[in-house]
Amino acid sequence: MVTYSTFIVIAIYLILTILISWFVNQRSIGNTDFSTGGRQFGWFTAGVSILATYISAMTFIGMPGWVYQSGMEALNIHLNYPIVIFFAVVFFIPVFYRMGFTSIYEYLEHRFGVYARTINSVVFILVQCISSGVILYAIALILIQILPISIVEAIVYITLFTACYTYAGGISTVIWTDMLQSAVLIAGSVAIFVLLLLQVDGVHGVSREQLNIINLQFDLGVDTTLWAGVVAVSFLHMSVYGTNQLIIQRTLATRCEKTAQKSMLLCGYGAFFIYFFFALLGVLLSIF
């Protein structure tokens, strides 16, 4: 049931986002600030921003739903973080940071030429349009349950609002609003977790199979095995943490190379525990 408190939370969030955008815009110095934020951010702020970037509304909705259907085995695809983060921190971040680039596509032009930069930039934009479309749709599905608007209107409003505050302050606004979004996400998740615990009458409805995390099957038709997570998904996560512009751009906004590496460590190892928490929500929902 939608209450006045729901609208109050949304209003406060929108107001804080606008204030952050205005404040950052007033402090903006030059064009480089738009892409790197003046390289002023600490490891915690940048790390939380990376987490908020990678863990979107799809995670909030999708991970509990996946565990609800497949059990805790869904966590297998996230067991590769120690391997992936090691390579990202040791081999990728130092190269991008030391060369002073504002994007990974500058490195592609430097290393392979302008055609490599252009092609990869276009592909990245197309992929992000598809990915962002899915995320926007997921958020809009929630928003139309609260506000008397259609799903098309919800998508348009979210897109325009996000584009405006991003354009006003660049990466600095994005990072600080990521902090705000993370706080809202954590508060909401914890509230749901507590409410479910209060409503659930014991764990009698949970089977051993649902709680089992490690799946050692060699079945290529199952996507929640340990081998799928450690071997196959490692390459996917390597591209995400090592060469994804959305992730790397935030590390390039930090004060120094060591700070950039620490921010990636926070994101990588923090992400697993967040996914684990959402997995527990899925278990609770299965017995709710």
Model-predicted regions and their roles:
Residues 16-31, 91-105, 164, 168-170, ...:
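Juxtamembrane interface elements at the cytosolic ends of transmembrane helices
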